[in-house]
Amino acid sequence: MRLASRFGRINQIRRDRPLTHEELMSHVPSVFGSDKHESRSDRYTYIPTITILESLQREGFEPFFACQTKVRDQSKREHTKHMLCLRRAGQLTGHQVPEIILLNSHDGSSSYQMLPGLFRGVCTNGLVCGQSFGEVRVPHKGNVVEKVIEGAYEVLGVFDRVEEKRDAMQSLALPEPARNALANAALKYRFGEDHQPVTVSQLLTPRRREDYSDDLWTVYQRVQENLMKGGLSGRTAQGKSSRTRAVTGIDGDVKLNRALWVMAENMLEFFGR
């Protein structure tokens, strides 16, 4: 819970400990942007993301992952969209760790946005939970710092519900037709209706021993990881050999992750859970 979209390739860093300011500056300089982009009006309240982050750190939230989009227009390098994944003190490590996903930019492409997510340590992969849990958006005006901190606690408050949903998915054994239906829907969402370069069977193939179970939660994670990380051998519409690409844009990551979560939730509801 990493990220091909219209924003292109990204700079990113993840550690199993809180990221330092030096690491953030090296990989995600837009976090430290010193002013709003020239295209923004006087009504735009400019607060560097690092100021927001330091306020969140005082509340016990620490960044473990950060990324920003690469841009062709170098004047936007310090204003481009970026993403931080934050964990609360006391929830820093574990098999599945809740994370607050913070999105922002200072070029007008994004307000402050916070989403609930889960980081799965065994595959170093992040999951974005669907919109059914809500999300927090804070526009760049007024008391931004206070509103973002309130938003972080609001997102923190939904993790009990996320865990309940995860437990329900883990308790549901999926029959083969349901597994195939979930994978087929995911393939069509990712690659379109006309041609899918890989098969349902490939998408359902586990990458490690821990993922051989056929409960809904594990099947969902297999599908998610195979789509997000790519690297699967396939065929183009013209029949040429190819490999699927990893999803490497912030918007693409969040959009696909949300859609997959909704598919898993719908499957859960279909079976009356």
What is the predicted role of each segment?
Residues M1-I47, E54, R58, S75, ...:
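Intrinsically disordered, low-complexity regulatory segments
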Residues Y46-S111, W261:
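Amphipathic, interaction-prone secondary-structure segments
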Residues M1-Q12, G90-Q96, L102-R273:
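Intrinsically disordered, low-complexity regions enriched in serine/threonine
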Residues H21, H27, H37, H79-H82, ...:
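Histidine (H) residue identity feature
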